[in-house]
Amino acid sequence: MRNRNGQQGVAMITVMMIVVVLSLLMVASLNYAMQGEPSSRRDQDWNAALAAAQAGVDDYLYRLQQDDEYVQYSATSPPTPANVAFTGWHNIPGPANSGQFHYSATDLASQGIIQVTSTGRVRGVQRTIRASMRRRGFLDYLYLTDYESLDPQSGYYSDPTTATSRCSEYWWQGRSTSYCVRISFVTGDTINGPLHTNDTISVNGNPTFNGAATTAYTGAMSCTASSSFTWRWYGLSGCSDRPVFQTGDPEVVPLLTLPTTNTAIKTETDRAAGKTGCLYNGPTRIVLNSGGTMTVTSPVTTSSAYASCVGTNVALPANGVIYVQNVPSTQTATCTGSQNRLGYPISGDVTSYGCRDGDVFLSGTLRGRLTIASENNIVIVANTTYSSTGAASTDMLGLIANQFVQVYHPVNSSGTNLSDSRNPTSTFTNPQIHAAMLALGHSFIVQNYNEGAQLGTITVNGGIAQKWRGPVGTSGGTGYLKNYGYDARLQYASPPYVMDIADTPYRVSQWAEVQNPTGLPA
């Protein structure tokens, strides 16, 4: 009996030890779980605070898209009805503790950007986003065209007025393909940047598009040749034309309507209103100097208000804006023989220039940020480049002409290239152009593109936007070959005030998390 009792005692002790061990394990597990819960909660709140900040950005963007003057409002100048996000914390709809946001906005008008700083808050955890918002516009593209048709004023059509009337239609609207000359991307063409056309992309062969391609053409055409496929481009030879879209077939996006005039930029030269831009009358020669100055000759600009804008090594305008207007009707302007007072055209050149036209003759090396707009044409007469290039460069040039942006190419009546002693290469060989260019009424074009011997390759670092397609050469060996590359900085930065002429919805172009600002509401 005593042995049996001893065995029972040992069993009891063993059971008690197991219970103790299990209890200790349960306590340890519970303690671990209790310690982990605050960490897990903090992680959730940390992520939720960033989402709340993003909700603030989305909220402001929505309001801005409904009212593009919304940037005028702030904590001290509130809208009606009031927006609590300016002065306090806006609750995100949903369960309790879904989060709150507070924001402020700054209008960086010279850069075409509205900068929104949005802070999200969840259970005391705060995180902040700074977002740049700007309109969709021509700066988003290496190549943007309204009509994929030869410019009626290119010199090809015998009756430019009739051509303008008949060719101011998109392909799907029934533009005459027998009368209007369609310009196609061909085998050997490589587009190294984003492209958009309001028209239908026209191809002949196998061009390569290395950037995203978009079109406002909403239809799709079917092909039932060796393989069945649909596409949103027009093949000159039908099914055998197969362009290479490296980022995928063209997407359909809304029509991007180009403004009809650049006069909004001219307002930045109004000295009576306190603006600091430079305004010139009639033909004006601008040479950009690598030290950050410019040399300007403008014979018909006589206003004392702009005396500091003319001469040798003058400073770039403080706000970075130059506007060249036609000579006002109240002012006299005369030619020197067949030339304007700048010596254009040179002797024997078949190109004509007006004595009263707001034409810019441009060359040089830019250090700084500058926008040059003209009431008539901008003529690039020699290399026009930045003093530094690359992602870190702050040099940026916008060229916006009401009519053409032209590359200077003088020829005589026999179609022979002419030399101009003012150009460092005499004849303008292998032009280098660093700029975002917009030809509102016409196109980016080489003068006399179908005359003279070929002069090498034209290199563009920036972007080209135009109403019609403008030729730079021909397959017969005239003009130039093309080497166009997109300046990726244009995705988030802008030459001064160029976006003033846009009339498209705002979008977020860039955002980053930043330190929480001081002075946040309690």
Residue ranges and their predicted role:
Residues R2-T197, L520-A522:
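Beta-strand/loop motifs with alternating small/hydrophobic and polar/acidic residues, enriched
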Residues N91-Q100, A105-Q115, D140-Y141, T145-V381, ...:
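C-terminal globular interaction/adhesion domains in large, modular proteins
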